[in-house]
C-alpha cells in the first residue's frame, strides 16, 4: 500500500496504518479518505499531500 506525505508539515499518511485516532481504519486508501479529512498534525487538506514513490 502507498504512503502520502503532507507538503506542509511532513506528516506521512500510511495506507497500511490508516488514521485510527480520526476514525480512519487501517488499510484505507488515500483516495477513499473523506473529502473533509485533513492532516492530523497541521490541518492541511488532502490537496496538500503527494504520493511517496517507492
UniProtKB/Swiss-Prot annotation:
Gene3D superfamilies: 2.20.28.10
Zinc keyword on record: no
Cofactor note: Binds 1 Fe(3+) ion per subunit.
GO biological process: alkane catabolic process
Required cofactor(s): Fe(3+)
Pfam families: Rubredoxin
Entries under InterPro entries matching the protein: Rubredoxin, Rubredoxin-like_dom, Rubredoxin_dom, Rubredoxin_ET, Rubredoxin_Fe_BS
Name the UniProt record assigns to this protein: Rubredoxin
Organism: Pyrococcus furiosus (strain ATCC 43587 / DSM 3638 / JCM 8422 / Vc1)
Name of the gene this protein is made from: rub
Amino acid at each position: 500500500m502507498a504512503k502520502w506525505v503532507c507538503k506542509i508539515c511532513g506528516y506521512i499518511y500510511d495506507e497500511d496504518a490508516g488514521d485510527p485516532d480520526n476514525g480512519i481504519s487501517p488499510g484505507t486508501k488515500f483516495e477513499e479518505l473523506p473529502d473533509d479529512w485533513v492532516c492530523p498534525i497541521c490541518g492541511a487538506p488532502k490537496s496538500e499531500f503527494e504520493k511517496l514513490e517507492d
